[in-house]
């Protein structure tokens, strides 16, 4: 665990606290030194849970589908605490696994009332007690992103929760409240155990479908929630982090992992964490976001290799970080240079623990992009990235991690250039394909997708888009550009043991940019907001974010 995620004394409200994931959430936040308000249904054992935790923790019986209960909860919280720092919306009911034709209307409505309307109601009431810096994390589901038979009500409710996560993130950003979600795959909870006992779920078949070869433990979901609720996720809002072992990265018939004779031990107990210093290589690590990532791993005591086309800057940063860190000048468009680099590192270290695949921002307005320019940019940022991933994978062992740096803007149809959108989309797919391929070997992959970050590259991006700094900030719900260190924190988390079930996922570190569907929404005033956070708006302006 990263000690910097621990902010003792925060008041954390956890709904659905008495069951699987909820109990793991309670345990993790309480261990952090936070004050936990555990909320669940009557007769769920939540009162006893609160009593066992002891003062100042609290257990409360609340039915989130009843508006009167939720209003009463807010009144009690207001009386007992001066403020609420974090809400985790975890209350929910699982799928009945009944066919659509056999699903009663009341059952469909009940799923919506608890999983969606209840979560929204609790968020709205609790937000009244929140100050800038507070966070709401919704526990959604992979079912809200992928269709499956016999899950109509459950899937619809979770898809709605993911959508509300985005809209609330935009609405409350001006108040300094972040809203995010996690989307777990299959988790070893009492809910899943009951479905398995009833013969409605074949867990052995699920394991074969997951590249990592197992279902998740509740604490793996709780650790992802803890990160999203922490100060280290300060530029993440509106994002949904998929925690599925790589399920979404597989799109082919048959299994993603070979059948296993016994239940993997990691489903029941968290393996012992290797606390030895890791060997980390950061490609493009000499300046900007890459340099911030290199510094973050170095702070942890890891050995960092800074590889960059700018050898002089790489040497300078390695010198600042300390004697054990290395620098190498590498042109990743030259295959032989990349191969030689990784051969040298394998010989020196034996294996690599983390590879961070940075990129060189090359921005040309769409009107100036010839096929030759497109190819040149792809050679650097996509083909070169592929070569690095290929060689890094050869150098890794079970437990190693590959992180690719992409961009949230690549998902916008108004990308700043054809090449920019193309290579970032390619990077995301490279992450997913390698997650499916390397997951069975115990190697995880993920994409970190920054939005506008305070670097020279961000200034060039704005220039290509034809925007000044005020216009740029208006486009971002949080009302500011991010810092390179905020991207580094996301990368550090994804490479950590706390992210052990995250594989093939993309994490947007963009201040809510990708959740904002039209220009100017992000800086909409909704309550008090400081002048620093709120740039001056231009009346009737509709910014064409990325068109020159």
From Swiss-Prot:
Annotated region (Short-chain dehydrogenase/reductase 2), positions in chain: 271-548
Signal peptide: none
Active site per the UniProt annotation: 154 (proton acceptor), 420 (proton acceptor)
GO molecular function, one term: oxidoreductase activity, acting on the CH-OH group of donors, NAD or NADP as acceptor
One Pfam family per UniProt: adh_short_C2
Enzyme class per UniProt: oxidoreductase
Annotated spans, Short-chain dehydrogenase/reductase 1: 1-250
Keywords: Multifunctional enzyme, Oxidoreductase, Plasmid, Repeat
Domain of life: Bacteria
Binding of NADP(+), residues: 12-37, 280-304
Documented EC number(s): 1.-.-.-
Ligand binding (substrate): 141
Gene3D superfamilies listed in its UniProt record: NAD(P)-binding Rossmann-like Domain
Coiled coil: none
Domain writeup: Contains two SDR domains.
Family of this protein: Belongs to the short-chain dehydrogenases/reductases (SDR) family.
Name of the featured protein: Uncharacterized short-chain type dehydrogenase/reductase y4vI
């Amino acid at each position: 665990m990263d000690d910097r995620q621990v902010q003792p004394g925060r008041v954390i409200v956890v709904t659905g606290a008495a069951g699987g994931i909820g109990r793991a959430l309670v345990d993790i936040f309480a261990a952090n030194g936070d004050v936990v308000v555990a909320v669940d249904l009557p007769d769920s054992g939540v009162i006893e849970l609160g009593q066992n935790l002891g003062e100042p923790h609290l257990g409360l019986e609340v039915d989130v589908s009843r508006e009167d209960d939720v209003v009463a909860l807010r009144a009690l919280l207001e009386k007992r605490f001066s403020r609420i720092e974090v809400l985790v919306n975890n209350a929910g009911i699982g799928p009945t696994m009944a066919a659509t034709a056999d699903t009663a209307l009341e059952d469909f409505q009940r799923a919506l009332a608890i999983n969606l309307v209840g979560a929204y109601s609790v968020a709205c009431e609790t937000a009244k007690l929140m100050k800038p810096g507070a966070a709401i994390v919704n526990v959604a589901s992979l079912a809200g992103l992928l269709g499956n038979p016999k899950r109509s009500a459950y899937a619809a409710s979770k898809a709605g929760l993911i959508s509300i996560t985005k809209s609330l993130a935009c609405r409350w950003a001006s108040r300094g409240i972040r809203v995010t979600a996690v989307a777990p795959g299959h988790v070893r909870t009492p809910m899943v155990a009951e479905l398995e006992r009833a013969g409605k779920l074949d867990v052995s078949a699920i394991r074969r479908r997951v590249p990592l070869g197992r279902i998740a433990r509740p604490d793996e979901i709780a650790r992802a929630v803890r990160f999203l609720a922490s100060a280290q996720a300060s530029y993440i809002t509106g994002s949904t982090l998929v925690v599925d072992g790589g399920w979404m990265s597989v799109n082919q018939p048959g299994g993603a992992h070979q059948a296993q004779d016994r239940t993997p031990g990691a489903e029941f107990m968290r393996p012992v964490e290797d606390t030895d210093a890791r060997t980390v290589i950061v490609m493009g690590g000499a300046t900007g976001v890459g340099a911030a990532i290199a510094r973050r791993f170095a702070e942890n005591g890891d050995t960092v290799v800074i590889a960059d086309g700018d050898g002089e800057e790489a040497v300078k940063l390695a010198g600042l970080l300390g004697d054990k860190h290395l620098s190498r000048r590498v042109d990743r468009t030259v295959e032989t240079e990349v191969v030689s680099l990784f051969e040298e590192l394998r010989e020196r270290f034996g294996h690599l623990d983390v590879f961070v695949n940075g990129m060189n921002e090359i921005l040309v307005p769409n009107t100036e992009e010839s096929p030759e320019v497109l190819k040149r940019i792809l050679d650097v940022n996509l083909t070169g990235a592929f070569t690095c991933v290929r060689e890094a994978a050869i150098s890794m062992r079970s437990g190693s991690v590959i992180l690719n740096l992409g961009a949230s803007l690549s998902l916008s149809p108004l990308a700043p250039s054809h090449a920019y959108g193309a290579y970032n989309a390619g990077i995301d797919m490279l992450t997913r394909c390698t997650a499916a391929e390397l997951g069975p070997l115990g190697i995880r992959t993920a994409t970190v997708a920054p939005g506008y970050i305070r670097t020279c590259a961000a200034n060039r991006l704005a220039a290509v888009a034809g925007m000044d700094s005020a216009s740029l900030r208006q486009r971002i719900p949080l009302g500011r550009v991010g810092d390179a260190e905020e991207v580094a924190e996301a990368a550090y988390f994804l490479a950590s043991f706390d992210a052990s079930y995250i594989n093939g996922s993309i994490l947007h570190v963009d201040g809510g940019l990708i959740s904002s569907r039209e220009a100017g929404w992000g800086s909409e005033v909704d309550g008090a907001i400081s002048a620093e956070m709120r740039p001056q708006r231009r009346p009737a302006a509709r910014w064409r974010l990325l068109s020159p």
